[in-house]
């Protein structure tokens, strides 16, 4: 049996430190070894305690969590889980933190929340098991300029991508390979509900295609990428004559809403062999069954390989199910999607 994950909790609120510590200490596989109220205390605690994982508040006095995270990643890389308020400002800072190299993020409890930090323990344990990879330097920096796709072919394909932990860096890496006239692309990324709008805005600034948070009824168009809104509804595609987004208020699937499986299932039914399915880094198994359905429908399917995953969970389950046709390093996935889109000539029936 492995030793419990050793965690340092950093937050300027004593109440929040106590709540996070109580939630984590309730798990027998986790031990909170220390607490810190600001970056200076945290720096000393990291040196003295050498924790496996740090939970870090975004907003702190003197040096904020984003600045401190940057120092950690440059000087002493380790898994860090960001704890953020569910506000637009908090979301923007969290997206920036995930780009810098934070392992994952959780939202602070809202009034009336009966299960605060319900996913935090699982994320801490996954972080402790992971070997943090600097995808920013190993993959994103090597991305070549995007190559345009034939417009006549781009509109006949639908690309569907699913991701979870590590997905912010992974999606930036993939989408920066896409040209302005990429095939219509739909994405489900597990993320708190207030964060996806900021993430879509960030992707839109960084990438050649237009990236937007999906809205109900939005028609799928060449050169556009649609990101499922977090937390409240599932993203599907429907209407073969004029494919568009549909947001549905169904119960969580695999513990997630939106669910990657729900998206993949709908794309398999709508597009079949004219779809391209991709499963990226993430915890759990969401998306594996849906990717298998895509492959059985004739779609090409790709999975991120273990070496470049922050968490080789979703891609591993998909691969073991036989859902993944080809495993690829993250830096090659965007280019392979475009090659596949250019090669397949069939239209949606």
From Swiss-Prot:
Keywords: Chemotaxis, Cytoplasm, Hydrolase, Phosphoprotein. Belongs to the CheB family. The active site is at 164, 190, 286. The modification 4-aspartylphosphate is found at residue 57. It comes from Rhizobium meliloti (strain 1021). InterPro entries: CheB-like (IPR008248), CheB_C (IPR035909), CheY-like_superfamily (IPR011006), Sig_transdc_resp-reg_Me-estase (IPR000673), Sig_transdc_resp-reg_receiver (IPR001789). Phosphorylated by CheA. Phosphorylation of the N-terminal regulatory domain activates the methylesterase activity. One of its GO terms (molecular function) is protein-glutamate methylesterase activity. The keyword Iron does not apply. It is found in: Cytoplasm. Residues 6-123 form the Response regulatory domain. The gene is cheB1. This is Protein-glutamate methylesterase/protein-glutamine glutaminase of group 1 operon. Involved in chemotaxis. Part of a chemotaxis signal transduction system that modulates chemotaxis in response to various stimuli. Catalyzes the demethylation of specific methylglutamate residues introduced into the chemoreceptors (methyl-accepting chemotaxis proteins or MCP) by CheR. Also mediates the irreversible deamidation of specific glutamine residues to glutamic acid. HAMAP family: CheB_chemtxs. Contains a C-terminal catalytic domain, and an N-terminal region which modulates catalytic activity.
